[in-house]
């Protein structure tokens, strides 16, 4: 057993008391990103090692793995703690997003270790979508690279406001203050073009040697700031969704017997209480909240991020994908929107194409009306393009098959985030963040009914020799 964990349990007076204490700790989700070989996996391994979160059998296995797959000679290769795929260990790189969990006396953490290779940028975007802070690693020998800029832009695009720039491998530049200062100035020059109000911090460190990771480095007396762990433990995270109006997307209708009918899902933003008047969109029907059912029993009030089942006073027609909000709020349905897109497929995104769209439990179809621009990651300039290639990032105009209730992604990631799904292969090919919904007055209405479009898709899928045209794509 982990001796630190055993000591913590003993200090709390038993397992039950320790678990209660864990529930009251704040949780920080963060990711590590940067260019390939900047030391992301090694940094996470060092954090786990120096906070003594590794079990004895894991440490023994790490010693053996370091001899077989390690790249650090006689030293422990801490990157092997998170590089779990065989291909990752053989190549010495991260391919998939690896999640790790650890806690200190002050906070709980969920880490997403994301790939650095450009071809795995889509994996990085996936990891960033649920995080509140990003650690951007920079190799002190190389400085700010294209992938550093790319990952910085994607992180801010996905709503991350806290960036920790970890200038790694300081041991390979003799712990030079001049090198640290130069890289910091280079990054700040670039960061001035990033959108939003950002909290940017810089930490010089060596993940391999442990300098400024969990303890202060004696090799860099010129740095008097916080260690990386201290930054993670003390950064104040203000969730945007807490201050936003109530949004409750219905995931499914919970009807275990004839006496109970509830609507299950996660409260995306705001708060809801028993007796509150709510409105169902897109129907516009209103009712009152009779009960709020949770895993721990009925509650009088719940807040954003909690999984709940709402029971209403009236028997009304509600299905998966519908949205509940405060009755006094006017939120019109829209049929068009401009969307920031991270494209994840080999086949480029082009105007005229149509895809299945999934947003907050709702699935519908959308047509690409046009691509306004693609962002040049090197300097964040916008350039006109005919299509959006793999790993491309740009602003796209979409028209949906039916009216949808949308928020801007920066206001509400749940009701403003969507994915593109290929209609034939059912593969996720892109991620979208609603930039601006277009009012219903200017949105184009669909020429065909949902039944006609579904029938058209089935005919083209099963009888391609008939040569039926794509109704949504050809409009």
From Swiss-Prot:
Q: Which SUPFAM superfamilies match?
A: EF-Tu/eEF-1alpha/eIF2-gamma C-terminal domain, P-loop containing nucleoside triphosphate hydrolases, Translation proteins
GO terms under biological process:
hydrogen sulfide biosynthetic process; sulfate assimilation
Q: Which InterPro entries match?
A: CysN_GTP-bd, CysN_II, CysN_NoDQ_III, G_TR_CS, GTP-eEF1A_C, P-loop_NTPase, Small_GTP-bd, SO4_adenylTrfase_lsu
Which controlled-vocabulary keywords does the entry list? ATP-binding, GTP-binding, Nucleotide-binding, Nucleotidyltransferase, Transferase
Which residue ranges traverse the bilayer?
none
Q: Which reaction does it catalyse?
A: sulfate + ATP + H(+) = adenosine 5'-phosphosulfate + diphosphate
Q: Where is this region: G2?
A: 92-96
A GO MF annotation of the entry reads: ATP binding
Q: Which CDD domains match?
A: CysN_ATPS (cd04166), CysN_NodQ_II (cd03695), CysN_NoDQ_III (cd04095)
What pathway does the annotation place this protein in? Sulfur metabolism; hydrogen sulfide biosynthesis; sulfite from sulfate: step 1/3
Q: Does the keyword Transmembrane helix apply?
A: no
Please report a single Pfam family linked to this protein.
Answer: GTP_EFTU
Q: Where is this region: G5?
A: 206-208
Q: Where is this region: G4?
A: 168-171
**Catalytic EC class:** transferase
Family (UniProt) = Belongs to the TRAFAC class translation factor GTPase superfamily. Classic translation factor GTPase family. CysN/NodQ subfamily.
What protein name is recorded for this chain? Sulfate adenylyltransferase subunit 1
**Biological classification of the source:** Bacteria, Pseudomonadati, Pseudomonadota, Gammaproteobacteria, Enterobacterales
